[in-house]
């Protein structure tokens, strides 16, 4: 059972604490903005670009404050034999797959946040994850 309020609070606390650890960089707390589940691009810009950059290459404004550099999301297909790892990306977004590179879970687990945002509408959560994954797939280098 997901506990969205507790997880959401933990994610916000994590974001705030990142600023404290990065002495030169201050991360301002921003509440999660509700976006359209139909737009993978809108979700990426609002939820992912702060760390991964608008181009998905890992150079977002909060990247320097992280212990481990954010992944370059434009080479996921390249690293997977030329095929975009749709299932793996979905698992990461839902929180089903752990990321060793993220160490202490610096990357928010979006599944529970999407669940809270959609007020428990499983179809909307799945739509968000599918459309965000499709947008990340569109960023892949050729």
Predicted regions and their residues:
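Bacterial N-terminal signal peptides that target proteins for export
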Residues: 1-8
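Hydrophobic h-region of N-terminal signal peptides that target proteins for export
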Residues: 13-21
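Electrostatic cytochrome c docking/interface patches
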Residues: 22-43, 81
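Sequence/structural segment immediately N-terminal to covalent heme-attachment motifs in c-type
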Residues: 34-57, 89
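Stable alpha-helical elements in mature extracytoplasmic
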Residues: 36, 44, 85-88, 125-128, ...
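Gly/Gly-Pro-rich "capping" loops immediately C-terminal to redox-active cysteine motifs
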Residues: 41, 57-90, 109-121
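Sec-exported extracytoplasmic/periplasmic mature domains
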Residues: 45, 49, 78, 94-98, ...
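C-terminal capping alpha-helices of c-type cytochrome domains
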Residues: 91-92, 103-142
